[in-house]
């Protein structure tokens, strides 16, 4: 009898099971990659929406100016504090938007406020708009149209509290701590394109600085001449003494001349050293000025490069697109390979 692993039927079953495993693995890889790509795209969309919301909010805030203002709700016809004051958050805000003024306040237990109306000193009803209605916190932010100079508002409200069967309408007056002030216009966002700084052109030196040549004064040696000996005696002894005196004076004259020559050389030598030192220092100063000018030119040339780099926008989204394309391509190739193997094995089994 032939062994089971040599049986052709057994081999075909093993092949079909292997193909099923490969197909299931490929399908799971494709599904996993699609789920990952979908989650990544959702995160990108959420981040984009959050950024847009932040930008819109910052734009709205920049278009309006506000200032806090304190107030108190008092009973009608008296200066006694009303219970309505406890259901409003303090302080309020004075807002100027689109050249219009609003008094903004937040109502606590907003579900109790069935009706609220505000009137000015001339008993004219003021427009009221809801800015934010938070059902979870049970608060409501409202804007009441006002004008600069208003000191108080008359309020007519309808409050219903089902838990205690409270259902009443009453009139109160809202007193501001100070009159509604006049606010400055909001600073509009600057849409002016930034001016690119132009590199300053270095000034070309027109005249080259020449080293100053120090003036050297020639020192004239002072030679002292000895007086002539006029003793001319007739005796021989005296003439001998005079000749000796003349030789001594000549020797002294030559010695003094040599000393004065040496002193002149000594004077000329330090003067020359001072002149050379000054010329070297002047040349070094000129070279330092040139190096500073070249450094300034290089710095000014680098500034437009940095500005151009700042202009470049960050390349966002390219990495995620590349990952998406590579993943889809890999999954497609794997699926095609598994299908081709499956078709090939079916042909062999037939």
Swiss-Prot record:
- What does the record give as the organism's lineage? Bacteria, Bacillati, Bacillota, Bacilli, Bacillales
Instruction: Tell me the organism.
Output: Staphylococcus aureus (strain NCTC 8325 / PS 47)
The name on file for this protein is Iron-regulated surface determinant protein A
Gene name linked to the record: isdA
The annotated consequence of residue 83 to A reads: Does not affect heme-binding
PROSITE patterns, per this entry? GRAM_POS_ANCHORING, NEAT
Provide ranges: composition bias, Basic and acidic residues. 299-314
Q: How does it assemble?
A: Monomer. Interacts with IsdC. Interacts with IsdB.
Polar residues bias: where? 252-268, 278-296
SMART domains cross-referenced by the UniProt entry: NEAT
Q: Which residues are involved in binding heme? A: 75, 82, 166
């Amino acid at each position: 009898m032939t062994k089971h692993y040599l049986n052709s039927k057994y081999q075909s079953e093993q092949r079909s099971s292997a193909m099923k495993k490969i197909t299931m693995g490929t399908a799971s890889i494709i599904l996993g990659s699609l789920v990952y790509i979908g989650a990544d795209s959702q995160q990108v969309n959420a981040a984009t929406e959050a950024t847009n919301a932040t930008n819109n909010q910052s734009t709205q805030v920049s278009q309006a100016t506000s200032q806090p203002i304190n107030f108190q709700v008092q009973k009608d016809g008296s200066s006694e504090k009303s219970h309505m004051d406890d259901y409003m958050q303090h302080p309020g805000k004075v807002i100027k938007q689109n050249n219009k003024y609003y008094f903004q306040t937040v109502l606590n237990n907003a579900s109790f406020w069935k009706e609220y109306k505000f009137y000015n000193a001339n008993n004219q009803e003021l427009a009221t708009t809801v800015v934010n209605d938070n059902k979870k916190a049970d608060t409501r932010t409202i804007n009441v149209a006002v004008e600069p100079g208003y000191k108080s508002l008359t309020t007519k409200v309808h409050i219903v509290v089902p838990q205690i069967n409270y259902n009443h309408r009453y009139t109160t007056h809202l007193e501001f701590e100070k009159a509604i002030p006049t606010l400055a216009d909001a600073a509009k966002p600057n849409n002016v394109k930034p001016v690119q700084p132009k590199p300053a052109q270095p000034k070309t030196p027109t005249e080259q600085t020449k080293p100053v040549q120090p003036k050297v004064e020639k020192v004239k040696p002072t030679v002292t001449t000895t007086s002539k000996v006029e003793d001319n005696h007739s005796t021989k002894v005296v003439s001998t003494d005079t000749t000796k005196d003349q030789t001594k004076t000549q020797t002294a004259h030559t010695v003094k001349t040599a000393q004065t020559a040496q002193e002149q050389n000594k004077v000329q030598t330090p003067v020359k050293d001072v002149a050379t030192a000054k010329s070297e220092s002047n040349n070094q100063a000129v070279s330092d000025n040139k190096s500073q000018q070249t450094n300034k030119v290089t710095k000014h040339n680098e500034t437009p490069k940095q500005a151009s780099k700042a202009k470049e926008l960050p390349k966002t989204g390219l990495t995620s697109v590349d990952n998406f394309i590579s993943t889809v391509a890999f999954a497609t190739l794997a699926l095609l390979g598994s299908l081709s193997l499956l078709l090939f094995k079916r042909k062999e089994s037939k």
